[in-house]
Amino acid sequence: MDSKANIKICQMSQKDIDSIKENFSSDFDKFWSYETLAQDFKSNDSTYFACKTVDDIVVGFIGLKIVLDNADIMNIAVKKDYRNHGIGSLLLKQAILHAMSKNCMQIMLEVNSTNSPAIALYEKFCFQKISVRKKYYNQIDDAIIMQKIL
């Protein structure tokens, strides 16, 4: 990736969801699937943002669900060859701004305890670890629950 100037963040469309099925198939794993993503996208209380190249190719996305004054980040993904270029930060910042615009008081998320890059990203944005679900993933890895007060 050349520059952040060559990308844009926008609200996701159904066309983008279809594109994700093709372009992110190797990024889906045993913990979440395209079908789960597509179903969540259609939910009235969910909002998804995409990071796209100038050629309109989705290279990252984030989804959040807002219920009353609480936002939950449901998922965030960046294509492998676009990682470590600030796209995750741009997506997370957009999600935080959206939650604030909806008068949310906090944002919650869950992350695999082995996902050090994601944990570092969330801590950079002042998310704090508030709880652990032992052996949550595959009865092996812990899930860390993180929260950001807005």
Regions found by a protein language model. Give the residues of each.
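Conserved N-terminal entry element of GNAT/NAT acetyltransferase domains
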Residues: 1-15, 131, 144, 148
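Acetyl-CoA-dependent GNAT
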Residues: 11-81, 92-94, 98, 102, ...
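Conserved hydrophobic/aromatic "anchor" residues
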Residues: 37, 61, 82, 121, ...
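Conserved hydrophobic beta-strand within the GNAT/NAT acetyltransferase core sheet
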Residues: 73, 107-111
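Residue-level recognition of the GNAT/N-acetyltransferase active site
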Residues: 79, 83, 110-112
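Conserved acetyl-CoA-binding loop-helix of GNAT-fold acetyltransferases
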Residues: 84-97, 120-124
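Short glycine/proline-centered loop/turn elements that form peptide/ligand docking sites
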Residues: 88, 92, 115-118, 135-140
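Conserved catalytic-core motifs of GNAT/GCN5-like acyltransferases
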Residues: 110, 123-144
